[in-house]
Each structure stands twice: as C-alpha cells, then as structure tokens.
C-alpha cells in the first residue's frame, strides 16, 4: 500500500496545469490607483513641489535631463500634466471637494509654469510641454522642437494668469501645508519671468542673431522692446501688491527685533544678512521648511572622485557635492599677509 501511495505522488508531480498562472497582484502602482482617492492624489501633487528643492550654485547641475546632480524638470512637467489630466476628471479622486480640486489644479499649473521658467532661465528657448505624451508616442511626437523665447514667456504668463486666483492668499495651516503655493508666489514667478524676458539677454540681443530655428528665424527677438519692460514693471507691482495686501509679507527690518540701539552700519549689515538667513521672515514668499542639517553638510563637503582617498567612491559621489565650496580661483583672490 505504501508503494502504491508513493507511486501516485510521483505520478502527480509529473503533471502540471495546461495554462500559465494568470493572476495579477493587488495594489500594483498605476495612475488610476494614484488618483482613486483624495489622499493619494495629494501625495502626487506634493511630489511636484519637491522638484523645486534644488540650487543653481554650479553649472554642473543639469536640469534638462537630471544628470550631474540636477533635477529632471521635464519629468516634473510631465508629472504636472498627468496630475492636471486626472484631477480635471470629476469622476476621479473620490472625496475631493470642488474648491480643493480648483486649488490643486491651480497649484499643478503654476508648478508647471515655474518649471518652464526655471528651464528658461538656464537654457533660453525650450520646448513647451503642455500635455504629457502617451507611452506609445511615435519618434516624431517625442522629438519636440524648442520654442522661441517670446512664446515660452507668453506660455508661462498665460498659464499663471488663468489659474492663480484659485490659490489661497495665505497658507492657513503652515504645519501641514508649508511649501504650498499662494497667489503672491504665483505672481512673483510671473514677475521674475517677465523681468528676465525684458532684460538685455533676451530683449534685442544681437549676439544671438545666428541662433536660429529650423525655419532660420531667431530664437531670441532681435528688436528691443520698451513694452516688455512696461509689462514686467506692471507684473512686479501686482506681485508686490499681492504680497503686502495679504498682511503676512513686508520688507525685512532687523531694527524691530533689536534689543539695544545699533550703529547704522551694523544695522544695515544685519538687515541684509538676516533677510536671507532668518527662517520664515516676512520677505519670504514661497519656501519649504526643513529641520535637517544633512543637506548643508553634503553640499559643503568636497566632491570626492575615485582615486582621491580610500572612501568608497560610489557612496561618496552620491553624498559629497561641493555645491557651496569656493573654487581655487576664488581662494587665490584672498591671500593672507603670509601669502597663503
């Protein structure tokens, strides 16, 4: 009997199912899951804000495609476009109030405008990415062309103008919403864009007369325009008015916090210094708070490359960035009395 039972087990082990196992695991990350409720959709939005945590202290940072310690801002723009597409559908994101929907869409649109502005200030004429391309897009669809500077600027301004009024004037719950956009922040981005566009770099700069597109037309306008300065000035007035009228912003004044009288020179220096270093002072319009000192440490440490010491190069290069480190040329401008 035991032999018969053993033989049956052996025969059973030689058999198998005709079809492959066709079971899809639960909770696979998809866009539909990302936007099926309010909480996950809001997390998607905050990822867009996180792309702004970057610096321009070194030209090695590549924001075009995210290399050399830069952030891939075209990927950030795609994330914004996906968010706008899904949240605009009122059949998605269960539990989302209409006022929240309008605010979130405005935030995503202004973030998209900001990322276009950031790329514009680094690279000049850039392609305008207003919609996310499908995964199966053809090569011709993916090969987008750079747009002229004036078109890029108009797109950024138009995107902000159509939605900034849906943003709050001030952040009421700073403990959970610090870093979220306000009307003043959106108008400040618009103003910075128009000031840059009116500057001599992009306003009639004949040094770029030979910088042409495929139609042999200049990417940068070759005619100076006073209207661009007027438009920029008006945008600056709007941004200042919005920041001051909300009651939370003003020019920083150190004298209001000074306990004892101070010489004018020292007071001037403290005003200049503290306006930059004092956390969340009144001049700060848009910021993301952090308590970590690790970022400061990795940015001031020398960039370690293979062969310089015995530290593991793969780990060192991922942490030591030297973004805040002066170059040798700068150091040599400040010799001591002993020559070093």
Q: Which residues does each PLM region occupy?
A:
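Contiguous, well-ordered alpha-helical segments that form the cores/surfaces of helical PPI scaffolds
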Residues: 107, 114, 188, 192-195
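C-terminal motif of bacterial Sec signal peptides marking the signal peptidase cleavage site
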Residues: 13-16
């Amino acid at each position: 009997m035991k032999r018969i039972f053993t033989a049956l087990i052996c025969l059973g082990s030689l058999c198998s199912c005709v079809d492959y196992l066709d079971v899809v695991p639960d909770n696979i990350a998809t866009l539909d899951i990302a936007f099926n409720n309010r909480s996950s959709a809001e997390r998607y939005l905050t990822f867009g804000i996180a792309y702004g945590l970057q610096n321009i202290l070194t030209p090695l940072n590549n924001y075009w495609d995210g290399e050399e310690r830069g952030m891939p801002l075209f990927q950030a723009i795609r994330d914004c476009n996906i968010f706008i597409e899904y949240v605009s559908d009122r059949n998605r994101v269960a539990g989302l109030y209409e006022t929240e929907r309008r605010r979130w869409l405005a935030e995503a649109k202004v973030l998209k405008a900001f990322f276009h502005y950031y790329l514009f200030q680094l690279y000049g004429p850039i392609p305008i990415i207003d919609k996310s391309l499908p995964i199966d897009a053809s090569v011709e669809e993916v090969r987008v062309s750079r747009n002229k500077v004036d078109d890029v600027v108009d797109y950024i301004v138009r995107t902000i103008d159509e939605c900034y009024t849906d943003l709050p004037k001030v952040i009421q719950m700073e403990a959970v919403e610090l870093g979220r956009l306000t009307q003043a922040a959106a108008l400040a981005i618009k103003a910075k864009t128009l000031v840059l566009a009116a500057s001599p770099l992009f306003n009639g700069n004949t040094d770029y007369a030979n910088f042409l597109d495929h139609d042999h037309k200049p990417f940068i306008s070759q005619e100076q325009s006073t209207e661009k300065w007027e438009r920029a000035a008006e945008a600056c007035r709007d941004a200042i008015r919005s920041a001051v009228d909300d009651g939370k912003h003003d020019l920083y004044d150190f004298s209001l916090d000074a306990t004892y009288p101070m010489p004018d020179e020292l007071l001037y220096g403290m005003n200049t210094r503290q306006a930059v270093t004092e956390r969340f002072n009144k001049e700060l319009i848009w910021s993301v708070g952090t308590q970590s000192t690790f970022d400061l440490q990795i940015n001031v440490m020398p960039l370690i490359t293979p062969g310089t010491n015995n530290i593991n190069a793969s780990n060192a290069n991922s942490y030591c960035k030297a973004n805040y480190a002066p170059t040798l040329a700068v150091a040599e401008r400040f010799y001591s009395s002993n020559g070093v």
